[in-house]
Amino acid sequence: MVINMDFDITVIGYIAGTLTTFASLPQLIKSLKEKDMSNISLAFVITFTTGLTLWLIYGILRNDYPIIVFNILSLMFWIPITYLKIRDEMRKS
């Protein structure tokens, strides 16, 4: 049996990307419904969003489509969360 390692590795990348990207969706939905971001750390949100951005840049530089696609999708979830968290923190002060 011949296994195409490039294909297998790409499939693993897409599965991992799907799981990690959509893992944040319930948090986004909950936060938007409740209009409450107090259960999320500002430091975490900023660090995580920065990390996603750096992963996207890395994926672009390496021309790695799973990394590019899933970090764009993740940023689509986390940029609004970041905005809402910063807005809520500014309202508190």
Swiss-Prot record:
* NCBIfam families for the chain: SemiSWEET_2
Where is this chain's protein located in or outside the cell? Cell membrane
Give membrane topology per the record.
Multi-pass membrane protein
Keyword set, alphabetical order: Cell membrane, Membrane, Transmembrane, Transmembrane helix
> Is RNA-binding found in the keyword set?
no
Q: Which lineage ranks, top first, belong to the organism behind this chain?
A: Archaea, Methanobacteriati, Methanobacteriota, Methanomada group, Methanococci
Gene3D superfamilies attached to this UniProt entry: 1.20.1280.290
Chief localization class? membrane
Which cellular component appears as one GO term in the record?
plasma membrane
Q: Where are the transmembrane segments?
A: 9-29, 40-60, 66-86
One matching Pfam family is: PQ-loop
Q: What is this protein called?
A: Uncharacterized protein MJ0110
